Amino acid sequence: MRRPTDDSLFTRAALIAVTVGYVGLFLLLPLLIVFFSALEQGISAAFAALKDADAQSAIHLTLITAAIAVPLNAIFGICAAWAVAKYDFRGKSILTALIDLPFSVSPVIAGLIYVLVFGMQGWLGPWLRDHDIKIVFALPGIVLATMFVTFPFVARELIPLMADQGRDEEEAAVTLGASGFQTFLRVTLPNIKWGLLYGVLLCNARAMGEFGAVSVVSGHIRGLTDTMPLHVEVLYNDYQYVAAFAVASLLALLAIVTLILKSLLEWRYADEIAAVHRH
């Protein structure tokens, strides 16, 4: 008869093996294949692909899009989390469900929504055309689509933190004469800064890797409205495999750097993060 400790050891080993095998097979192996394929013709060929004018345009557009969408979503996430966590009002459950909407709606549908609203034949198309404003097939449309698919990340990180924090500290600060901004800066922000940082990092990684929604609203204009994921598709369809994998490798490296930064911050400030959660 097996002892309970034997069963637990076997179960633990089996679960670890399954997890490691799954991660290795479906995550690490494809990632390694991407890097090896990018360097198949040497590092000079990979760098040449990254220096191509269309690749440079895609890189710049991706970074600009993330630089605009992420701060705006951070502001929205703070406001939405504050409203949901601190106040009770009619429609609160509906607002919470709407915050999660991008998790359940296909990014392609999100892109089509913006085309129907802002496209030349859309609801606002004639007005935009008369005022010489271009949203679809231009940077504004790409930013809007990216914001749609990424806006839940910051809010979802902050809502539980703000709910646990309560309102006592803010009310005490206001009673002592602090303004709303001072209360947020000195009381609320220190308690949510790690959740805010994690949400921003996840939002940034998702923004740079977004494909579906951006593909619909960008028009796929090579050298103008192609982001890095779209440029990878174009290169791959043109049988330029080394160039495609080179750009994909850069995109993967950006995501890896984001994860490494998150892990380093967790390790460096582990005690402070634990203290915030205990509080």
Indicate where each model-derived feature is located:
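Periplasmic/extracellular loop-to-transmembrane helix junction in inner-membrane transport proteins
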Residues: 2-13, 34-71, 86-87, 234-242
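Transmembrane-helix boundary motif in ABC transporter permease subunits
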Residues: 2-8, 46-49, 68-100, 112, ...
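Membrane-interfacial helix termini and adjacent extracytoplasmic/periplasmic loops
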Residues: 2-5, 43-51, 56, 91-92, ...
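C-terminal transmembrane helix and the adjacent membrane-cytosol boundary/short C-terminal tail
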Residues: 7, 14-18, 26, 33, ...
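Interhelical loop and adjacent transmembrane-helix boundary motif
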Residues: 9, 46-48, 53, 208-264
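Transmembrane alpha-helices
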Residues: 17-22, 71, 97, 101, ...
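Hydrophobic alpha-helical transmembrane segments of multipass integral membrane proteins
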Residues: 25, 60, 64-76, 80, ...
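Membrane-embedded alpha-helices of multi-pass transport/permease systems
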Residues: 28-32, 36, 75-80, 109-112, ...
